[in-house]
Amino acid sequence: MKNTILLLFTAFIFLMGFFGMSADALADPKADPLAGPFPDADPDPINMKAVAAVAKKPLG
């Protein structure tokens, strides 16, 4: 019984990490779920066209 509870708790923690749920998100359910943990970290979006162009160069 004790091992089953420990296994279920470990699986729950693993799934929270796998799906990106943090303790802050669980503590504040009204927070924006799409906002990252550091919204001011990178104000410029990634230019996917430039990334694709750089990736195509070595591939031909």
Curated annotation (Swiss-Prot):
It is found in: Secreted; Target cell membrane. GO terms for biological process: defense response to bacterium; defense response to fungus; innate immune response; killing of cells of another organism. One of its GO terms (cellular component) is other organism cell membrane. It comes from Vespa bicolor (Black shield wasp). This is Mastoparan-VB2. Residues 28-45 form a propeptide. Belongs to the MCD family. Mastoparan subfamily. Residues 1-27 form the signal peptide. Expressed by the venom gland. Keywords: Amidation, Antibiotic, Antimicrobial, Fungicide, G-protein coupled receptor impairing toxin, Immunity, Innate immunity, Mast cell degranulation, Membrane, Repeat, Secreted, Signal, Target cell membrane, Target membrane, Toxin.
